Amino acid sequence: MSKRLTLNFFVILIACLIWFTPVVWVISLSFQPNELLQKTTTNFLFGFFPIPFTVENYIKMWSSSFDVWVMNSLIVAICATFFTTIFCSMAGYAFARIDFFGRKFIYPLVLAGLMIPGELLFIPLFTQFSNLGLNNSHVGLFLPKLAIPFGVFIMTQYFKGVPKEVEEASIIDGANRLQIFFKIMLPLAIPALFTVAIVNFGGAWNDYVWPLVSASETNMRTLQVGMSLQLGNRLGMYMGTSLAGIIISTMPTIFLLVYFQKYLLRGFAIGTK
């Protein structure tokens, strides 16, 4: 092994240790009793040895309103991901393939949305949703997440890379625009679709500020909001329970990133072209 490879290996090893050490520590603490954690949280090394080992924290978390929060987060994240993927793919196909009036003006305008913080729109969104009666509802939670300029950009770049001969051959065979889009272009755009879906699911699942503003009723809280409001003020008393909830809340996004990693990387690579 050359010196350069050895140096790269040790750099990567150190980076992995820096990243994994707090993760392993948090996982270990989540399997320790709350009463014990109140006395020993200042001892860093103690956290790596879950003795006595217990799953009581996970049971307590599920016995509260945790299942309601998880269900709300799943509904919001799945609905936002499904509709955003459809709308972004349609918009991307239109910008990449259809020569309509104003396309060269509208597309940069859409991309300009990447530079606008979402929090800047909370007041007008909250006012409009209040007038429409959409606050404290699942629709009101996921509807603002449907306008994603990033997804439109990824899909547009991907469709631009598909040879036009594919569409021309389909037109010769008698296919119309919708048939070309759903039967030809969408199957070819699976990597880009997965990229948009994973990024949007993670954003919707981890979103905190908008659900906090939009949903004031307890039964409409998402996972992040519920954990913050119910356990945040009692972190010292229920540290193990809080950490158990944190571990559970991160599992869906970690699973998606690991399982669909190859699609995600391909989609990002295409978006940089």
Question: Model-predicted segments: where are they?
Answer:
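A structural signal for multi-pass alpha-helical bundles of membrane permease subunits
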Residues: 4-273
